[in-house]
Amino acid sequence: MGSQWGKDKAYLKAKQSGYRSRAAMKLKEIIQKNPVIRPDDNILDLGAAPGSWLQVLREMTNGVIVGVDLNPILPIEGVRTIIGDFSDPVVIAQIRELMPEVNGIVCDASPKLSGQRSFDQARAIELNEMALGVARQLLKQGGNMIMKSFQGEDFSWLYNRVKQEFYSVRTYKAHTTRKGSTEMYIIAKNFIGTHQGLEESVSDGSA
């Protein structure tokens, strides 16, 4: 672990709390500022490895929690995991078998970053569209979603896409986001629930 990690307060706090990555601190902050998960919600985590968000979700809800990732996830008590592409119809069928209903979806998935921002952002938007496709198939009407993306020329387009699917949409930049990062979270509440093929406020971390 490089020295920059040793100086990273979010990383140190996550490690001290037993979480698998600093991303756990982001989710805790996001939900504290945007309470979109209820105590009995069934939550689906897309792009869940290494599992830090699953750990946080397990603390927040007594509902069914399922994590999906291309990579294996070490076991977490009370959490089910699926190895596979979350847009794969076979994986969608597996999720349906494990979850009676999906009240919330979280997605912290990110492409492997090349360092070329426009290219990386375009690939992130593709992942966002895939996650929205899953929501349209599985998310219960009135459900909520938290999704990571990256600011860039296509971000407004994505934001408007999400607004077509949810009654309330806002953006949130976590305090624990690294300096210079274009990372931005979309907080979407009250899914309209069309369940068809894919198809207001804006704040920063001080909200």
UniProtKB/Swiss-Prot annotation:
The highest taxon in the source lineage is Archaea
Where is this chain's protein located in or outside the cell? Cytoplasm
Alphabetical list of InterPro entries matching this protein: RNA_methyltr_RlmE, RNA_MeTrfase_FtsJ_dom, rRNA-MeTfrase_E, SAM-dependent_MTases_sf
Q: What is an example of a GO molecular function annotated in this UniProt entry?
A: rRNA (uridine-2'-O-)-methyltransferase activity
Q: Where is the active site?
A: K148
Q: What keywords sit in the KW lines?
A: Cytoplasm, Methyltransferase, rRNA processing, S-adenosyl-L-methionine, Transferase
Enzyme Commission code(s) on record? 2.1.1.166
Q: Which reaction does it catalyse?
A: uridine(2552) in 23S rRNA + S-adenosyl-L-methionine = 2'-O-methyluridine(2552) in 23S rRNA + S-adenosyl-L-homocysteine + H(+)
> Which Pfam families does the protein's record reference?
FtsJ
The entry's cellular-component GO terms read:
cytoplasm
Q: What is its main location?
A: cytoplasm
Q: State where S-adenosyl-L-methionine binds.
A: G51, W53, D69, D85, D108
Check the record and name the PANTHER family matching this protein. PRE-RRNA 2'-O-RIBOSE RNA METHYLTRANSFERASE FTSJ3, RIBOSOMAL RNA METHYLTRANSFERASE
| HAMAP family membership | RNA_methyltr_E
Query: What is stated as this protein's family in its record?
Result: Belongs to the class I-like SAM-binding methyltransferase superfamily. RNA methyltransferase RlmE family.
Briefly, what is this protein's role?
Answer: Specifically methylates the uridine in position 2552 of 23S rRNA at the 2'-O position of the ribose in the fully assembled 50S ribosomal subunit.
Q: What is this protein called?
A: Ribosomal RNA large subunit methyltransferase E
Q: What is the lineage of its organism?
A: Archaea, Methanobacteriati, Methanobacteriota, Stenosarchaea group, Methanomicrobia
